[in-house]
């Protein structure tokens, strides 16, 4: 095993998060839409894709807490990572070569189950293995690797035209990352198996007021983030319209323009995550969350008032820096307030729902957007981004209520 708690150790500890976010970025953005388009008539495309997304979202809500619970019951993490990673690779190959839409559905559901099996227990490793004074750094590395996975996936999606090769690459990366974690990280020896029943375990963390506040604040910030992210491409197409900066035309289509902004946000986040985590170990979690959250809220105004692509490029970078700091410190914050050391995987699985639920809910703002845009062009985006700004502010201010972290 590696020397614990050096930078390389943190890097390997979170390497499966790199593989996981690489996988989901390509699957949700590129591969699922493309495979559905190959397998169903054009008129049914959006409906069939929506069905897949909905099924996946429901499973992503219930899967991690349940696999986390099983992992806590057994008192082990790594066996789930191994089995989950192997099944993930199998499901990806099946998705790549599925001959019908329903085969694709089953393969995708298998992928969800396999992913939850691996990442539910895996998410307990930071609270399991790191002391409170180093969780900021550990979470910072996690944030950097998650974002790095997205950047790498974006590059691969851009450069590698063959869809089957993309699936194979994701499968390979999953196995390599799981192998790294397995060979170089030792899980907590003799973790006492959890004895509570499933319902009792799923309800237990909610009895802690701090856990409720951590869940709610994360939920609000993520809801704001996904409200912006989900409709940004349409905002670029409808309001910004031309994509010039520094005398150059950088993109001709809105989807290229949004990909570039996404890349800049990710780069900003990758830069800020580890330093922010380190600062939070020294000076406390809350000050950094206050700065990042208020900053994200304030950014909503220039996005609305100056709808020019060159301005958005700069704002995307700033957004990324703040968002990376928030992500890093938030994971450390929840690790600090988990009530029961024997239930880390269950509790982290429940906390993860505060990230999945906003993704699902963000889709429901589309109708409101259309209604307001019909009244006056662009009005919908103003309303949407202002609501997002309010969620950023609320999700930041309410962190004050968390008592057991500073």
Regions found by a protein language model. Name each.
Residues 1-7, 187-216, 242:
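Juxtamembrane intracellular "pre-TM" segments in multi-pass secondary transporters
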Residues 2-56, 212-213, 217, 221-246:
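Helix-loop boundary and gating motifs at the non-cytosolic
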Residues 50-69, 260-275:
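Central cavity-lining transmembrane alpha-helices of secondary-active solute carriers
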Residues 56-61, 136-158, 352-363:
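Glycine-rich segments within core transmembrane alpha-helices of 12-TM secondary carriers
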Residues 71-85, 282-293:
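Cytoplasmic membrane-interface "Motif A"-like loop-to-helix N-cap segments
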Residues 77-78, 159-173, 367-391:
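A membrane-interface helix-boundary motif in multi-pass transporters
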Residues 83-99, 294-307:
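C-terminal ends and interior cores of transmembrane alpha-helices
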Residues 96, 176-186, 386-406:
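Multi-pass alpha-helical transporter architecture, strongest
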């Amino acid at each position: 095993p590696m020397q614990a708690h050096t930078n390389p150790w943190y890097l390997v500890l979170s390497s499966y998060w790199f593989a996981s976010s690489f996988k989901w970025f390509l699957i949700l953005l590129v591969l699922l839409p493309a495979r559905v388009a190959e397998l169903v008539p054009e008129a049914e495309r959006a409906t069939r894709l929506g069905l897949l997304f909905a099924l996946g979202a429901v499973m992503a809500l219930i899967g991690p807490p349940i696999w986390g619970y099983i992992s806590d019951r057994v008192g082990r993490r790594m066996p789930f990572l191994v089995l989950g990673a192997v099944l993930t690779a199998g499901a990806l190959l099946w998705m790549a070569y599925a001959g019908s839409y329903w085969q694709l559905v089953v393969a995708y559901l298998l992928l969800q189950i396999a992913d939850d099996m691996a990442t539910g227990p895996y998410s307990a490793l930071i609270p399991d293995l790191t002391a409170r004074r180093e969780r900021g750094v550990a979470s910072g590395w996690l944030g950097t690797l998650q974002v790095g996975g997205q950047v790498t996936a974006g590059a691969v999606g851009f450069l590698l035209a063959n869809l089957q090769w993309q699936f194979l690459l994701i499968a390979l990366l999953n196995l390599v990352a799981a192998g790294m974690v397995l060979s170089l990280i030792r899980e907590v020896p003799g973790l006492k198996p959890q004895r509570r029943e499933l319902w009792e375990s799923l309800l237990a963390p909610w009895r802690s007021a701090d856990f409720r506040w951590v869940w709610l604040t994360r939920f609000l910030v993520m809801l704001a983030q996904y409200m912006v992210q989900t409709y940004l491409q349409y905002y670029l197409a409808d309001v910004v319209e031309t994509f010039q900066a520094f005398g150059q035309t950088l993109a001709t289509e809105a989807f290229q323009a949004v990909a570039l902004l996404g890349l800049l946000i990710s780069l900003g986040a990758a830069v800020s995550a580890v330093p922010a985590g380190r600062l939070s170990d020294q000076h406390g979690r809350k000050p950094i969350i206050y700065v990042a959250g208020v900053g994200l809220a304030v950014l909503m105004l220039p996005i609305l008032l100056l709808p020019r692509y060159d301005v958005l490029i700069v704002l995307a970078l700033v957004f990324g820096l703040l968002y990376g700091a928030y992500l890093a410190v938030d994971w450390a914050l929840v690790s600090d307030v988990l009530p029961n050391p024997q239930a880390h995987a269950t509790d982290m699985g429940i906390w993860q729902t505060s990230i999945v639920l906003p993704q699902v809910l963000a889709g429901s703002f589309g109708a409101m957007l259309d209604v307001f845009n019909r009244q006056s062009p662009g009005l919908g985006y103003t309303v949407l981004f202002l609501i997002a700004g309010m969620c950023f502010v609320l999700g930041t201010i309410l962190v004050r209520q968390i008592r057991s972290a500073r």
